[in-house]
Amino acid sequence: MGKVPSSFRSMPANLLVRKTTPSPPAPPRDFRNRTAVGGDSAKLPQNTQAPREPSLRNPFKSPNLSDAKSLFNSIAATSRIPLDLKFHNSVLQSYGSIAVVNDTVKLFQHILKSQPNFRPGRSTFLILLSHACRAPDSSISNVHRVLNLMVNNGLEPDQVTTDIAVRSLCETGRVDEAKDLMKELTEKHSPPDTYTYNFLLKHLCKCKDLHVVYEFVDEMRDDFDVKPDLVSFTILIDNVCNSKNLREAMYLVSKLGNAGFKPDCFLYNTIMKGFCTLSKGSEAVGVYKKMKEEGVEPDQITYNTLIFGLSKAGRVEEARMYLKTMVDAGYEPDTATYTSLMNGMCRKGESLGALSLLEEMEARGCAPNDCTYNTLLHGLCKARLMDKGMELYEMMKSSGVKLESNGYATLVRSLVKSGKVAEAYEVFDYAVDSKSLSDASAYSTLETTLKWLKKAKEQGLVP
């Protein structure tokens, strides 16, 4: 033997090392007494990733502990090079990827006993900790067991330890255990950094009621002086906006000043998007005006969101006014801007106006996409402008533009109702050949429409 297996030699020694981050400033007011009207996300900076299984072939053929000890003893006895920390970490990670937590810990203890020169490092215990948190057979007692081993070997759990444990538990759906462990580690050892705190907060928002999230925020602040930052507030506001609880969102915004923070453009855009989704154009405009009053400069996303919301609410003239404001502010309208406006115009029956907007869009060098064409196709067919609709369809077909379900269904129904069944079959063929829709979906729409036509003829509703 004599050679260390390549899969052991390939594992990096500093797999889990990362820089710590200072805690956030400024406390918010008490959340505890707030109750949510709705039920239960802001992007977070990427943080430490817990260790993954080795990419090369695992030298351990079986999870059997005796076999693992024998393999390790054989390598240790015949190796011509010193076995360093990297090697021992690789052994534990490779074996841990196929074994239960209890056996992995026992192999670690065997290595300690049989190798007097082995001094486990922090990365060693983080490998064991990650395995204890991720293993499907593991309980929280195994996590505590690894943490106790760490302390007994002279290494206090730090922010990296908390980060690895919390992320690993959350990624396996054990959010309650992650929450309890964070509080325990904060009390006994070290508070989490902002990234870990916000990571857990985001997961709590995804799977817990809002009052549970507020209780966690209050406990961490009151008991451990760990306070939410602007990212934390953005996570909370994004969560309540997604649950359509916009009153709570505005409440949280009103408390940002008390917490020493100033809302940024991203946060205002999040709230505006919530109002626009509910077709509350006036409230969306109110958010825009508040931004301006607070000295927060709107960006392209702000204008696109506002134009989308106003168009959806049928307030097309206002949407066009903000299109001009957007250009005056130095932002070039993009495909999303024009498509939103076209959709609003088609909803109001202004399909020809939407079609002229397509020409304006292309004249400005902005390329329409599949959604743009399908929006116009749907609008023209709904307005019974079949000549224009077929002209647009032929242009789409020659350019290889795919049909979307709404545009396809409206076109097929309009053709059948106009007595142009052969043309409807041709549209069906294109939808299938271009893989715009599945065969079943495309045929279902055509079949339903033809059944309607047959019934209408029987009742004398159509010639």
Curated annotation (Swiss-Prot):
<dbReference type="InterPro" id="IPR011990">
    <property type="entry name" value="TPR-like_helical_dom_sf"/>
</dbReference>
<feature type="repeat" description="PPR 7">
    <location>
        <begin position="334"/>
        <end position="368"/>
    </location>
</feature>
<feature type="repeat" description="PPR 3">
    <location>
        <begin position="193"/>
        <end position="223"/>
    </location>
</feature>
<feature type="repeat" description="PPR 9">
    <location>
        <begin position="404"/>
        <end position="438"/>
    </location>
</feature>
<keyword id="KW-0677">Repeat</keyword>
<comment type="similarity">
    <text>Belongs to the PPR family. P subfamily.</text>
</comment>
<feature type="repeat" description="PPR 2">
    <location>
        <begin position="158"/>
        <end position="192"/>
    </location>
</feature>
<feature type="repeat" description="PPR 6">
    <location>
        <begin position="299"/>
        <end position="333"/>
    </location>
</feature>
<dbReference type="InterPro" id="IPR002885">
    <property type="entry name" value="Pentatricopeptide_rpt"/>
</dbReference>
<feature type="repeat" description="PPR 8">
    <location>
        <begin position="369"/>
        <end position="403"/>
    </location>
</feature>
<feature type="repeat" description="PPR 4">
    <location>
        <begin position="229"/>
        <end position="263"/>
    </location>
</feature>
<feature type="repeat" description="PPR 5">
    <location>
        <begin position="264"/>
        <end position="298"/>
    </location>
</feature>
<feature type="repeat" description="PPR 1">
    <location>
        <begin position="121"/>
        <end position="157"/>
    </location>
</feature>
<dbReference type="Pfam" id="PF17177">
    <property type="entry name" value="PPR_long"/>
</dbReference>
<dbReference type="Pfam" id="PF13041">
    <property type="entry name" value="PPR_2"/>
</dbReference>
<dbReference type="InterPro" id="IPR033443">
    <property type="entry name" value="PROP1-like_PPR_dom"/>
</dbReference>
<feature type="region of interest" description="Disordered">
    <location>
        <begin position="1"/>
        <end position="63"/>
    </location>
</feature>
<dbReference type="Pfam" id="PF01535">
    <property type="entry name" value="PPR"/>
</dbReference>
<protein>
    <recommendedName>
        <fullName>Pentatricopeptide repeat-containing protein At2g17670</fullName>
    </recommendedName>
</protein>
